[in-house]
Amino acid sequence: MDGDLNLDYSKPIYIIGDVHGCLETLCALIEKLPQKWDSQIIFTGDLIDRGAKSCEVVDLVMKYNYACVLGNHEELMLEYYHAIPSKGYNKIWINNGGYEAMESYQRNGGFEKIHEHLEWFLKLPRFLEIPLCDEKGQRLFVTHGFGLPYYKEKEKKAEMVTWSRLKSHNWEKEAKKNYGVFNVFGHDVRKVPMIMENFAAIDTGCVYVGDDSKSAVLSALEWPSKQIYQQDNCER
């Protein structure tokens, strides 16, 4: 469930998609939220890699004690630094944004800071289920990947919850099922948020500036209203 998040269910929750080291864009988006820095925020993971300020983004999330689920990029970094057993992905990290992350850490404390953040990553849950319901009585289910198909076996198949993509499932069929939860996730980059009856894909590729197939926008979904807040990439 919501663990030790100490959420106030009389106030909305804001779920923010994959940040990927885009610090200025994240700060600008938070400034657009009604309660700004006092907002109840949950991140879908992938705080790091590709963008220039991975270390700074993680520091910010830790400073404000915002909630976050484990993203596949955090898992790749954990494996690269041998904080978790190898699954054969360790060489993938560097070529998928890890190099930029390393540069960020070199500017901000080096291995001491890396160790601090790896310890924090190890404590991140793979999913959060929040008993704050929408108009249909659906609880909030936050994951990094498309977790809905694994909801009934989420403990047993927790790793799949992190890595799952829409294209691996019949999402139109999933959208018609009643799990009692509404799944908000990142991982699948889309030009605009995809909001269905029981899930929302909110990674709008904020780091991908110059790629016409992506919007280079950071998105947040307000729960339970499902209103979307967005910020164009504004990295300097």
Spans of model-derived segments:
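N-terminal active-site segment of His-dependent metallophosphoesterases
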Residues: 1-58
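His/acidic metal-ligating clusters that form di-metal
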Residues: 112-192
